[in-house]
Amino acid sequence: MGSDRSCVLSVFQTILKLVIFVAIFGAAISSRLFAVIKFESIIHEFDPWFNYRATKYLVNNSFYKFLNWFDDRTWYPLGRVTGGTLYPGLMTTSAFIWHALRNWLGLPIDIRNVCVLFAPLFSGVTAWATYEFTKEIKDASAGLLAAGFIAIVPGYISRSVAGSYDNEAIAITLLMVTFMFWIKAQKTGSIMHATCAALFYFYMVSAWGGYVFITNLIPLHVFLLILMGRYSSKLYSAYTTWYAIGTVASMQIPFVGFLPIRSNDHMAALGVFGLIQIVAFGDFVKGQISTAKFKVIMMVSLFLILVLGVVGLSALTYMGLIAPWTGRFYSLWDTNYAKIHIPIIASVSEHQPVSWPAFFFDTHFLIWLFPAGVFLLFLDLKDEHVFVIAYSVLCSYFAGVMVRLMLTLTPVICVSAAVALSKIFDIYLDFKTSDRKYAIKPAALLAKLIVSGSFIFYLYLFVFHSTWVTRTAYSSPSVVLPSQTPDGKLALIDDFREAYYWLRMNSDEDSKVAAWWDYGYQIGGMADRTTLVDNNTWNNTHIAIVGKAMASPEEKSYEILKEHDVDYVLVIFGGLIGFGGDDINKFLWMIRISEGIWPEEIKERDFYTAEGEYRVDARASETMRNSLLYKMSYKDFPQLFNGGQATDRVRQQMITPLDVPPLDYFDEVFTSENWMVRIYQLKKDDAQGRTLRDVGELTRSSTKTRRSIKRPELGLRV
C-alpha cells in the first residue's frame, strides 16, 4: 500500500513538474513577443542586421561559399573577408531551422521570421538548461525557481526579445548547457558528460566571442579545487576530456584558428591542463615514496614549473608567438584604459560602466537574494558550489565595469536567488512537524504564513516588474521609435527605414555611403548600399577617416570623401524631436578617434568653447561650427521656427540662421519626416572650373530661395 502511494505521488510530481515547465517555457517565449505585437516582425538594432544579412547569404548559397565569402560592399575600398571574420554558429543554426521547417515539414516560412523568433525560442531552452544546472547545485524545486526566473528576468530579456537576432540570443543558452554538462562531469567523472560539455563549448565558440569566459571559468574552478585539496580522478577525467576535445574542436572555427594555443586569453586553460597532469602524477607518486620526500619533490617541482611557465609565457609573448591581452581585456581591469588608448572601444555604449540602479532594474528582488544564495552555498561547500561562487564573484565585478556583461551575470543571479528562495520555502512551507510544541503554538504557524506569503507577494511583484520592463524598455526595435502626439496618441517614428528605403530606391546600386560606423550594418541590410565603415570596427584608421571627414571644414571633408569615391553622406540629427542618440552627441568620439591618428590636424580642444564647454549655439567654437557634421545637422533647422530661432531639444540650446554656415560642396537630397535622418550628395565639379565655394557664393548673392518646411506634429521627446 505504501509503495503504491509512493508511486502515485512520484507520478503526480513528475506530471506537475512537466506542467510547470510547460508554463515556464510558454512564459519565456510569450514575454518576448511584445516587440512583434507592438510593432511588427522586424530585425532590431544594429548588429542583428548584419547577422540577418549573413543568414540570407547562407540560405541562398552553399556553406562553403559562406565560409569563403568576401564582402566588397562593406569597408570600401578594402572590403571584408566576412566568412573568416565572424562566428557562424548563429547563422548556421537559423539556416538549419529554416531548412527543416521549409524542406522537411513543408512550411513556407521566410528566413526573416525565423531570425525574428530565434531568440524567444532559445530562451525556453535556456530555462531548461538553468533548471538542470540548478538541480545539480541543490534540487529540483530550486531548479524550477531558477528556470522561472531566467525565463522572464529583464537582464536576459534585454538581449533575447523577438527581433534581437544577435549572438547573445543563442550564447546564453549554450553557456548554461555547457556549465550544466561540466557540473555533471565534475561530479561523476563521466567522460560522456565531459564530451558533451566540450561539444557545446565548441558550439559556443562558433556562436559568440564571449566563449573566452567559459575558457577561463572552468579552469579557475579546477584550479580552486586543487588548491582546496579536492583533487580526484573524477576531476582529472572531466577536465582533461573537456579541454582536449573542446580545444581541438574550437580551433576548427576559422575566426578562432590557433588562438587557443597562441593567445594569452586562453593560457589559463592550458596552464591548468598542465598543472592537473602534475597533480595526477604527484598523486600517483605519493603512494610510492615517503610523505617527507613527496613534499620536497612537489614543492621543488611546483616552484620550477611556476618560474618556467611565467618566463616562457613572457618570452613567447615578447617574441610574438603568443598574442597579448586584447584592449577589451585591459578595459575590464582599468576602466580608463580604453578611453585613453582605444577610444573606439570606449565609444560603444555597451562598454560603459553600469549604474547601480541598473542591477535592480534588470533583476528586481533577485539582486538581494543573490548574496544570500551565495552565502548558503558557502555553508555547504561542495565542489559544484565552488563553481557557482567563482562564477558569482567574477561576473559581479565584470558586470560593474561593463554594461553588456550584465547579461552573463544574470544567470548566476537567478541560480543563487533560486537556491536562497528554495531554502526559505523548504523551511517555511513545511507545515508538517512531529514536534508537539510547534503543533500547539499558533505563533509558529503564523510566522510561516507571513514569511511564505511575503515572498509569494515578492514573486508577484517580480513578474509584474519584469513584464513592465520588457514591454516598455526592451521591446523597441530602435529602427522604429515609439512616441506621442500632443494629444497623447501613439506615434511611430519610422525615419530610419524611410531614409534607408529612399537610398535603396533613389541611388545607384553601386553608390557609396559615408556614415558613422553605428549605422553601417543597417545601411547594408536595409538600403543595400556600399558603406565605408560598419559595426565590425576592425580597422580603426578607416573609422578615423570618416571621423576626420565629419570633423573637418567642408572643403577638406569634400576632398577626403571624394578620394574614397563617396556619393552620399548620411547623418543622424535628433535636435528637432529630442532624440539623444544622434551624431552631434557622438561627435566627440569621432573627434577623439580621428585625433588618435592625426593629432596635428584634429584636436578635441578646438571643439570646445574658451570656457571648456561643448556647445552648438552662438557660443560654439569656430572649429565646431565649420565642421561638416555641424553644417549638415543644422542646415535649415532654424527656419523651421517662427522668427528663425530654433531650440535644439537635446542640447537645450538656441540656434539661429547666423549660427549655421552655408553648405557649398554638398546638396541636401533627403530629410526624413521628423528630421532624424538627413542625406547629402557630393556635388559634381563645376563645368567652368570654378570652385564650389565660389559657385555657392554667386548663387546666394543672385537668388534667395525659400524652402517650404513642414514641422512634425510630435510634441514629446523620444
Curated annotation (Swiss-Prot):
Keyword line: Endoplasmic reticulum, Glycoprotein, Glycosyltransferase, Magnesium, Manganese, Membrane, Metal-binding, Transferase, Transmembrane, Transmembrane helix
GO BP annotation list: post-translational protein modification; protein N-linked glycosylation; protein N-linked glycosylation via asparagine
CC cofactor: Mg(2+); Mn(2+)
Region (Interacts with target acceptor peptide in protein substrate): 516-518
Motif WWDYG motif positions after renumbering to this chain: 516-520
Glycosites: N60, N535, N539
Topological region Cytoplasmic: 1-8, 138-139, 189-190, 228-232, 287-300, 379-384, 428-441
GO cellular component, one term: endoplasmic reticulum
Ranges of the Lumenal topological domain: 31-118, 158-168, 206-210, 259-266, 323-355, 402-405, 465-718
Record-given protein name: Dolichyl-diphosphooligosaccharide--protein glycosyltransferase subunit STT3
Organism: Saccharomyces cerevisiae (strain ATCC 204508 / S288c) (Baker's yeast)
Top-level taxonomy: Eukaryota, Fungi, Dikarya, Ascomycota, Saccharomycotina
Annotated gene: STT3
